[in-house]
UniProtKB/Swiss-Prot annotation:
This is Phospholipase A1. GO terms for molecular function: phospholipase A1 activity. It is an enzyme of class 3 (hydrolase). Belongs to the AB hydrolase superfamily. Lipase family. The active site is at S140, D168, H233. It is found in: Secreted. GO terms for biological process: lipid catabolic process.
Length: 304
């Protein structure tokens, strides 16, 4: 009985709901939401909703996701729903057993994806949330979950999510899969991928835009080891939070044998990483130089 269970039933999934009125958030379940009375407004038609999804051996109240939630709320009067599927992510298992549970956590990603699709449909039906105002941001296994949520939502024949942001999507047991078994550019109208590690993540292009931070691996300030790999993998979340928090734009240059310097960038061929990426005309793969310390800015204040 020592093997990690990493069991997940949908009833165990909870979430932290945060708004400008309640920035610290409250832990809730879908049952409590269905009974009503939690959202004090019944009409959320003008509210932006962001689903945030953690990765393997993590949880919704991990400081990196709390920081991103704060940054999102400072920038927009939105509602952040940080999904907590820690039981299924092996977070509660014995330290030494956590990693053995990874394949089970991978299986659980589909359950969580379906949960999010159902949840978003409920928000639209019961609270008048507009599909155009929904965005999913997932890290690691959470990015794969966001992709599965996008696929599940499309089964309702009600359209597609406008945007999914995959922060260093998990590579192991996904990277050689075809589109139906991993996050894919068809999961939303615009799929933005940030690559920061090539062992825990993948260098494979997956989205409408793929940003390769520092070539997509060995992030500055992280070291060459398993710890360094974890550090690089987590950097994706930190980079994105800084892109939300600061007007500083991390500029992506189209990938080529010798990418042009950021200083030569214009709006038409380069793209800023972040919530406004889809406003730029260019899609494809981009190289993003980064600094080793927050806000990781690469552009000396240049705006494009």
């Amino acid at each position: 009985g020592l093997l990690p269970k990493c069991k997940l039933v949908p009833e165990q999934i909870s979430f932290i709901l945060s708004t400008r009125e309640n920035r610290n958030g409250v832990f809730l379940t879908l049952d409590s939401l269905k009974k009503g009375g939690i959202l004090n407004k019944s009409d959320l038609s003008s509210t932006q909703v962001v689903f945030l999804i953690h990765g393997f051996i993590s949880s919704a109240n991990n400081s990196n996701y709390m920081d991103m939630t704060k940054a999102l709320l400072e920038k927009n009067d939105c509602m952040v729903i940080s999904i907590d599927w820690r039981n299924g992510a092996c977070t509660n298992e014995f330290q030494i057993l956590k990693f053995i549970g990874y394949p089970k956590a991978v299986e659980n990603t589909r359950t969580v994806g379906k949960y999010i699709a159902d949840f978003s449909k409920l928000l639209m039906q019961k609270y008048k949330v507009s599909l155009a105002n929904i965005r999913l941001i997932g890290h690691s296994l959470g990015a794969q979950i966001a992709g599965f949520a996008g696929k599940e939502y499309q089964k309702f024949k009600l359209g597609k999510y406008p945007e999914i942001i995959g922060l260093d999507p998990a590579g192991p047991l996904f990277k050689s899969n075809d589109c139906s078994q991993r996050i894919c550019e068809t999961d939303a109208h615009y799929v933005q991928i940030i690559h920061t590690s090539n062992n825990l993540g993948t260098e494979r292009t997956l989205g409408t835009v793929d940003f390769y931070m520092n070539n997509g691996y060995n992030q500055p300030g992280c070291y060459y080891s398993f710890i360094g790999e974890t550090c690089s993998h987590t950097r994706a979340v930190q980079y994105f939070t800084e892109c939300i928090r600061h007007e500083c734009c991390l500029i992506g240059v189209p990938q080529s044998k010798n990418p042009q310097p950021v200083s030569k960038c214009t709006r038409n061929e380069c793209v800023c990483v972040g919530l406004n990426a889809k406003r730029y005309p260019k899609t494809g793969s981009f190289y993003v130089p980064v600094e080793s310390k927050a806000p990781y800015c690469n552009n000396k204040g240049k705006k494009i």
